[in-house]
Amino acid sequence: MASQKRPSQRHGSKYLATASTMDHARHGFLPRHRDTGILDSIGRFFSGDRGAPKRGSGKVPWLKQSRSPLPSHARSRPGLCHMYKDSHTRTTHYGSLPQKSQRTQDENPVVHFFKNIVTPRTPPPSQGKGRGLSLSRFSWGAEGQKPGFGYGGRASDYKSAHKGFKGAYDAQGTLSKIFKLGGRDSRSGSPMARR
């Protein structure tokens, strides 16, 4: 008798489980049925169209609106990761285009890579060539006043704004000037006010 009741209880519990999941699916309580469009669109937003299924492409009208706050170089079809990689390679290729044919045979690729990373920071004219990466670098440096990024235009501002500090700090480099001025600005020029 006990062996006959157990399978009947199992069948009953299975039936109840399937009925409850179907009931949840009908009313939309399972996150699987409700969130697939949002998750697909988020995945497509970050990884591009290659990995996401095509079924939700027509159902999400706000996907194009959510891309609008991005900069104009990231709006085209491939994913954001590819665009940033492309803009990075574009800046290095444009910056080293005349020398590239000579460098690749003579130098180690690692040395070539490090030279390409270091060179776009020092000359300000290279900012016009590689638009996406250097513009983001420049604006980031202007907002956060980070020393390595975009100090080309900021150094002249510092020089013109702080002419009173010139005497002792003229012999030092630009980076040390920015560090010293940043430290003094954060302490809110109290020595100048006392003088």
From Swiss-Prot:
Q: Does the keyword DNA damage apply?
A: no
GO molecular function per UniProt: calmodulin binding; protease binding; structural constituent of myelin sheath
Q: Subunit notes for this chain? A: Homodimer.
Annotated family:
Belongs to the myelin basic protein family.
Sequence positions bearing N-acetylalanine = 2
Query: What does the entry give for GO biological process?
Result: maintenance of blood-brain barrier; MAPK cascade; membrane organization; myelination; negative regulation of axonogenesis; negative regulation of heterotypic cell-cell adhesion; positive regulation of chemokine (C-X-C motif) ligand 2 production; positive regulation of interleukin-6 production
Tissue specificity remark = Found in both the central and the peripheral nervous system.
Residues recorded with modification Phosphotyrosine = 15, 94
Q: What job does this protein perform?
A: Is, with PLP, the most abundant protein component of the myelin membrane in the CNS. Has a role in both the formation and stabilization of this compact multilayer arrangement of bilayers. Each splice variant and charge isomer may have a specialized function in the assembly of an optimized, biochemically functional myelin membrane.
Pfam families per UniProt = Myelin_MBP (PF01669)
What keywords sit in the KW lines? Acetylation, Autoimmune encephalomyelitis, Cell membrane, Citrullination, Membrane, Methylation, Phosphoprotein
Residues bearing the modification N6-acetyllysine: 146
Identify its membrane topology class.
Answer: Peripheral membrane protein
Organism, by scientific name, is Rattus norvegicus (Rat)
Where does the record place the region Disordered? 45-79, 117-139
| Residue numbers carrying Phosphoserine | 8, 13, 20, 41, 57, 101, 139, 186, 190
Protein known as: Myelin basic protein
Q: Which residues carry this modification: Symmetric dimethylarginine?
A: 131
- Where are its TM segments located? none
Annotated positions for site Cleavage: 114-115, 138-139
Give its localization: Myelin membrane
Residues annotated as carrying Deamidated glutamine in the record are 127, 172
